[in-house]
């Protein structure tokens, strides 16, 4: 199937599955093309590409897999290509006269990543119009509602007004993204709270209300995919909602490094310093990547001191505690701990279920409790994987015209993940992981010692073996030094009770589940 045959059909599918406003605003105007054999969806700018990839790529790919499975995945990049009209009915492929735009010379395909920044240029000064300025300017020029009946027009005046307001809001949103690099999707309203992030969320909201005061810097650490980026960007979006004139910037540490090296190379160091010092809130993701770069660390040390002395807010994320960042300047390690340092924990079962329910609500899909529980038990490691699993199930729900996600649909959509989770886990793997986690010997786990520091990890390992393998109780007993099945049963029951009563053991158990499954 050619792109000219596929895209009109894809438009028809997307039109049928998306709300009318979303389709008209984001999908209908798209142009597409082919570069080096790769199908490309063009957005008018970086903001549009990021929005398309985060919100609609899954749906587009689901259609491609159904109708053109032999083709590689689409890439998303800024530019202009050919616009096709939507197929009138399924199978009717009537592309409109191609609208070839200037600059048809083939460009190398560059895939747009979700966390990619708009450009590698130094951070732009905030002297340009703010999002609020643009919105106010556009709204001021809108036509007023007529007091009397106007002459017949091709569209009602109210529709013109509504479209103009929508365009103004979208332009203002794009302007905000260009200035701040904040995603409009990452807000406190869209954040699901649970035990793993509740304290961090409360601190983040306090910072948004009074930046630069008590919690400065705010250092957030944890494994990949736990929601650090969502939480820190929510601070920026909330601050701008309360103070539209605030100067905010979110960036990845790689982009800070690139902009600094470019300033050194171009002898624009003074401009670089002023660009960063202007912000009221600076958010840097994955700060650990500046380690080992002496000049960059030295410059960031001075920038840090400026923010602290001027009571401007600095928010940093990392994968480990500040003290554990090997190769980081000791002065920076010390300063990273001056404010508030918090860890994001993997989401517990209740939080994972709540995330799935919120995703379903946002997508206009109903999910049965049994299906949500199944998916939440299958994906334990992080929020990103959980959302990815839901997107797959949601796509299956739409294409199969099943408005309710039940457990059978979830199993069918995620069957490859189910197979992957269970195909390599053995009792030996679990015993080894538990021994390393509790820093005891494997021989102790299998032996006869009954001291608490040995017996409890042994019971945890038995319980994990029961949950993650298909072994019977007698077989589990054999794997643990030839123990009787009643001993295994007693250990499993003891761990189940302790998980309800002892938060520390419950947390250890969840961490081991994630460690073993990944």
Curated annotation (Swiss-Prot):
Q: Which GO terms describe its biological process?
A: DNA replication initiation; regulation of DNA replication
| Domain I, interacts with DnaA modulators: annotated span | 1-72
UniProt keywords (A-Z) are:
ATP-binding, Cytoplasm, DNA replication, DNA-binding, Lipid-binding, Nucleotide-binding
| Listed GO CC annotations | cytoplasm; plasma membrane
Region annotation Domain III, AAA+ region: residue ranges? 181-397
UniProt xrefs under SMART domains: AAA (SM00382), Bac_DnaA_C (SM00760)
Main localization of the protein?
cytoplasm
Residue numbers spanned by region Domain II:
72-180
Region described as Domain IV, binds dsDNA: spans on this chain = 398-518
Q: Which InterPro entries match?
A: AAA+_ATPase, Chromosome_initiator_DnaA, Chromosome_initiator_DnaA-like, Chromosome_initiator_DnaA_CS, DnaA_C, DnaA_dom, DnaA_N_dom, DnaA_N_sf
Q: What does the record give under GO molecular function?
A: ATP binding; ATP hydrolysis activity; DNA replication origin binding; lipid binding
Extract the PROSITE patterns matched here.
Answer: DNAA
**UniProt binding sites for ATP:** 225, 227-229
Any Pfam family matching the protein: DnaA_N
What top-level branch of life does the organism fall under? Bacteria
| Localization of this protein | Cytoplasm
Q: Which HAMAP family match?
A: DnaA_bact
The protein's matches in NCBIfam families, at most eight in alphabetical order, are given as: DnaA (TIGR00362)
Assembly with partners or alone: Oligomerizes as a right-handed, spiral filament on DNA at oriC.
Q: What does this protein do?
A: Plays an essential role in the initiation and regulation of chromosomal replication. ATP-DnaA binds to the origin of replication (oriC) to initiate formation of the DNA replication initiation complex once per cell cycle. Binds the DnaA box (a 9 base pair repeat at the origin) and separates the double-stranded (ds)DNA. Forms a right-handed helical filament on oriC DNA; dsDNA binds to the exterior of the filament while single-stranded (ss)DNA is stabiized in the filament's interior.
What the record says about family reads: Belongs to the DnaA family.
Domain text: Domain I is involved in oligomerization and binding regulators, domain II is flexibile and of varying length in different bacteria, domain III forms the AAA+ region, while domain IV binds dsDNA.
Q: What is this protein called?
A: Chromosomal replication initiator protein DnaA
| Organism whose genome encodes this protein | Neisseria meningitidis serogroup C / serotype 2a (strain ATCC 700532 / DSM 15464 / FAM18)
Q: What is the lineage of its organism?
A: Bacteria, Pseudomonadati, Pseudomonadota, Betaproteobacteria, Neisseriales
